[in-house]
UniProtKB/Swiss-Prot annotation:
This is FYVE, RhoGEF and PH domain-containing protein 3. Residues 500-512 have a biased composition (Low complexity). It holds the Pfam family RhoGEF. InterPro entries: DBL_dom_sf, DH_dom, FGD1-4_PH2, FYVE_RhoGEF_PH, PH-like_dom_sf, PH_domain, Znf_FYVE, Znf_FYVE-rel. The gene is FGD3. Residues 370-469, 604-703 form the PH domain.
C-alpha cells in the first residue's frame, strides 16, 4: 500500500504485541498496511478517520469488536475473531483486488510469502512482522528518512540492516513467548489432553528456547555493544543456522495443527473459552491463535531475504564476507529442509487419496510407501490382443494393476493384481501390428501393456527400471546380515544366501563334511507341496505350528523347520545357535561359526547393529538396524518373517524420538521409542552405552544432520512427569 494512503493508520491494538522501540529498525511495511480499520478506513472518510485518530475501536458489550469494525488478517489468510466472513471484501477495495482475498495453504511457506505479502524490497520484507509499531511507516518523514539513508555510507547501511534484524528478532521472540508460555501453558492448565497440546504446538518450546536463549542474546550483544569494534553478523548466523532445521518438524505439522485448533474450538467450550480469552488481551493484538502459529512458518525465508540484502551491501573484501555467504548457504538449506518436510506431508496426503480411490482394498498408507507414478494405460488381451482400459499405481515397493470402476463418487478403482518390485522385470517389445507396447513380468504374472505415445512408453519403462534399481540398492544394505535374522522368506529374494528353510533345496548333513564349514550338501525337494507341508509342522515331532503355543524355529545347521521343544539343543550363552536333535548329535555346535556376525556393510552406514523391536512393548523380535550414509534420514530395519511387515523403512524426520517413562515397566531394558503419526515402535539395545549412541545418532539424523557436520543433537522429548536430562 502506498505510504500516502495509509498515513492515518493508528497503532491501535496491534502495536501492543511487539512493543518495539522506535528507530531505524522499526518499520513494518509488509503486513500492517494491509489491515484496514473500519469500513472506510482507506477511503478518506472523515468519520472513519476521526475514529482512527483516537485509536479506540468500537467494543461491544461482550468485549468483542462490533460488526461495523472488522480487522481482517490479510497476511495469513485467517480471519481475526471479529471477522465474520473469510476473505470478505471491504469498501474501497473493489478496485484493488481482482478477486477474494488469498488464503494461505497450510504449511506452504513460500506460497504464504508470495501470495500474502505485498511486493516489497527484501529489506522491507524482512521487517514486515505483524505487531510492530507503525510509528513512522507512512508519515511524510519516511520519505526523508529513506532519502537520507540512501546517502549513508556502506557501513551505516550494514548497521541499519543489523538493527532491523535485531528488532524483528525481538518481536519474533515475543510471538514465540506468546505461543509457548501463554497459549500452550493456559491450555495445559485448563486440562486439555497432552496429545492435543503436542499436536497443536509441536516443538514450539524448542524453537522458543533456541531464539530466546541463544540467537537473540548473541545478536543483541553484537549489535548494541560490539558493533563498533566487530561489525559482523555472518559468524553468529553460521554457528547457529544449522539449528534452524528444527523448523521442518513444525512446518510439516502446521496443517494438522490448524485443523486441531478448528476442531477443538467447535467441539470443546473449554478450549474455545481459553483461546478467545487470550485473543482478547492486549498482548495478543486482537489476532487469532492461527495467525500467531503462522509466524514460525514464515520466519526462515525472512532470514534468507534479509541476509541476501546484507550480502548485497557487504564489500567483496569484507572480513565477514565468507561467514555471511556460508550462513546464507546454511539458512537456504534450512528452508529446503522445511520444504522437504512439506513434501513428505504432501506424499502422505497423496497416499490417503489413492487409498480412498481403491476403496481400502490395499493398506498402502505407510510412512515407508511412496507413490512414484500413476496413470491410465491399456492392457492387451492375451486371447485376441484387444486393448482394455486399466490404471497403474507405481510405488517404491510394488505396482498395483487396477480396473476402473464406473462411479461418480467413492471407490474409483479395483485392484486386479499386486506385483512386488522385488523380482520385477520390465522389457520393451516391438510388435508389427501394435505400437507403444512393453511387458512387466512378475513372479506370478506377466502384463503386456500399451501406451498412447512412444514418449509415454519410454517414461514408464525408465521410471519402473529406476525404481527396481533403487530397491535393489536398498536390499544390498542388508544382504550381509540376512543369514543372522532370516526366518521364512521367499526363496527368489536371495537364491544364493546362506542356508535357510526358504532355499529351493533342502540341506542335509553329510559324513565327509565337504560342503562348507558345516559339512552340508544340498538335496532336491520332491515338490512344492512337500515344502509347504514341512513349513507347517515340526520336522522332529510332526506337530502343527501356531503363533501362540507352537512357534516355528529353524535349525542353524540344516535349516529344518522345528518347534521350540525340539530345538533346545543350543550352545551355551548363544540364543542364535538353535539346532535340531539330528544335527546336535552329528555336528559339534560352534557359536563362533554358526552364528553369522555381519562383518561388512556393502553400503557405509552412520550406525548399524542388532536391536530388539516391539510395537506394543511386550513381544520383542530381533532386527538388524542401519542408518545408511547415502540416506542418513532413514532407518532400515531387517528381520525375520515372524514380523510380517519386515523389512521396513522408517523416515526419521517424520518421527518423534523419546525415552519411555520408567513406570511403563517394559519387558526389555535400554529402550527408546520412535513414533510417527499413530504408529510407534519400541527399540531396545543391549547396553546403556549403545542406547545412548543410537539416541544421539537418531536425534541428529532426524533433524537433517550427519555425524560429521552436526553441531550437536537437539534435546530429546522427555515424557511428562519425568525429569529432564
Amino acid at each position: 500500500m502506498e505510504s500516502g494512503r495509509g498515513s492515518s493508520t493508528p497503532p491501535g491494538p496491534i502495536a501492543a504485541l511487539g512493543m518495539p522501540d522506535t528507530g531505524p529498525g522499526s518499520s513494518s511495511l509488509g503486513k500492517l498496511q494491509a489491515l484496514p480499520v473500519g469500513p472506510r478506513a482507506h477511503c478518506g472518510d472523515p468519520v472513519s478517520l476521526a475514529a482512527a485518530g483516537d485509536g479506540s475501536p468500537d467494543i461491544g458489550p461482550t468485549g468483542e469488536l462490533s460488526g461495523s469494525l472488522k480487522i481482517p488478517n490479510r497476511d495469513s489468510g485467517i480471519d481475526s475473531p471479529s471477522s465474520s466472513v473469510a476473505g470478505e471484501n471491504f469498501p474501497c477495495e473493489e478496485g484493488l483486488e481482482a478477486g477474494p482475498s488469498p488464503t494461505v495453504l497450510g504449511a506452504h511457506a513460500e506460497m504464504a510469502l508470495d501470495s500474502q505479502v505485498p511486493k516489497v524490497t527484501p529489506q522491507e520484507e524482512a521487517d514486515s512482522d505483524v505487531g510492530e509499531e507503525p510509528d513512522s511507516e507512512n508519515t511524510p518523514q519516511k520519505a526523508d528518512k529513506d532519502a537520507g539513508l540512501a546517502q549513508h555510507s556502506g557501513p551505516q547501511k550494514l548497521l541499519h540492516i543489523a538493527q532491523e534484524l535485531l528488532h524483528t528478532e525481538e518481536t519474533y521472540v515475543k510471538r514465540l513467548h506468546l505461543l509457548d508460555q501463554v497459549f500452550c501453558t493456559r491450555l495445559t492448565d485448563a486440562g486439555i489432553p497432552p496429545e492435543v497440546i503436542m499436536g497443536i504446538f509441536s516443538n514450539i518450546s524448542s524453537i522458543h528456547r533456541f531464539h530466546g536463549q541463544f540467537l537473540l542474546p548473541e545478536l543483541k550483544t553484537r549489535i548494541t555493544e560490539e558493533w563498533d569494534t566487530n561489525p559482523r553478523l555472518g559468524d553468529i548466523l553460521q554457528k547457529l543456522a544449522p539449528f534452524l532445521k528444527m523448523y521442518g518438524e513444525y512446518v510439516k505439522n502446521f496443517d494438522r495443527a490448524v485443523g486441531l485448533v478448528s476442531t477443538w474450538t467447535q467441539r470443546s467450550p473449554l478450549f474455545k473459552d481459553v483461546v478467545h480469552s487470550i485473543q482478547k488481551q492486549e498482548v495478543c493484538g486482537n489476532l487469532t491463535l492461527q495467525h500467531h502459529m503462522l509466524e514460525p512458518v514464515q520466519r526462515v525465508p525472512r532470514y534468507e531475504l534479509l541476509l541476501k540484502d546484507y550480502l548485497k551491501r557487504l564489500p567483496q573484501d569484507a572480513p565477514d564476507r565468507k561467514d555471511a555467504e556460508r550462513s546464507l548457504e546454511l539458512i537456504s538449506t534450512a528452508a529446503n529442509h522445511s520444504n522437504a518436510a512439506i513434501r513428505k506431508v504432501e506424499k502422505m496426503h497423496k497416499l490417503l487419496e489413492v487409498y480412498e480411490q481403491l476403496g481400502g482394498e490395499e493398506d498402502i498408507v505407510n510412512p515407508a510407501n511412496e507413490l512414484i507414478k500413476e496413470g491410465q494405460i491399456q492392457k492387451l488381451s492375451a486371447k485376441n490382443g484387444t486393448p482394455q482400459d486399466r490404471h497403474l499405481f507405481l510405488f517404491n515397493s510394488m505396482i498395483l494393476y487396477c480396473v476402473p470402476k464406473l462411479r461418480l463418487m467413492g471407490q474409483k478403482f479395483s485392484v486386479r493384481e499386486k506385483m512386488d518390485i522385488s523380482g520385477l522385470q520390465v522389457q520393451d517389445i516391438v510388435k508389427p501390428n501394435t505400437a507403444h507396447t512393453f511387458i512387466i513380468t512378475g513372479r506370478k504374472r506377466s502384463l503386456e501393456l500399451q501406451t498412447r505415445t512412444e514418449e509415454e512408453k519410454k517414461e514408464w519403462i525408465q521410471i519402473i527400471q529406476a525404481t527396481i534399481e533403487k530397491h535393489k540398492q536398498n536390499s544390498e544394505t542388508f544382504k550381509a546380515f540376512g543369514g543372522a535374522f532370516s526366518q521364512d522368506e521367499d526363496p527368489s529374494l536371495s537364491p544364493d544366501m546362506p542356508i535357510t528353510s526358504t532355499s529351493p533345496v533342502e540341506p542335509v548333513v553329510t559324513t565327509e563334511g565337504s560342503s562348507g564349514a558345516a559339512g552340508l550338501e544340498p538335496r532336491k525337494l520332491s515338490s512344492k507341496t512337500r515344502r509347504d507341508k514341512e513349513k507347517q509342522s515340526c520336522k522332529s515331532c510332526g506337530e502343527t505350528f501356531n503363533s501362540i503355543t507352537k512357534r516355528r524355529h529353524h535349525c542353524k545347521l540344516c535349516g529344518a523347520v522345528i518347534c521350540g521343544k525340539c530345538s533346545e539343543f543350543k550352545a551355551e550363552n548363544s540364543r542364535q545357535s538353535r539346532v535340531c536333535r539330528d544335527c546336535f548329535l552329528t555336528q559339534p555346535v560352534a557359536p563362533e561359526s554358526t552364528e553369522k556376525t555381519p562383518t561388512a556393510d556393502p553400503q557405509p552406514s552412520l550406525l548399524c547393529g542388532p536391536l530388539r523391536l516391539s510395537e506394543s512393548g511386550e513381544t520383542w523380535s530381533e532386527v538388524w538396524a542401519a542408518i545408511p550414509m547415502s540416506d542418513p534420514q532413514v532407518l532400515h530395519l531387517q528381520g525375520g518373517s515372524q514380523d510380517g511387515r519386515l523389512p521396513r523403512t522408517i523416515p526419521l524426520p517424520s518421527c518423534k524420538l523419546s525415552v519411555p517413562d520408567p513406570e511403563e515397566r517394559l519387558d526389555s531394558g535400554h529402550v527408546w521409542k520412535l513414533q510417527w503419526a499413530k504408529q510407534s515402535w519400541y527399540l531396545s539395545a543391549s547396553s546403556a552405552e549403545l542406547q545412548q549412541q543410537w539416541l544421539e545418532t537418531l536425534s541428529t539424523a532426524a533433524h537433517g544432520d550427519t555425524a560429521q557436520d552436526s553441531p550437536g543433537a537437539l534435546q530429546l522429548q522427555v515424557p511428562m512427569g519425568a525429569a529432564a536430562p
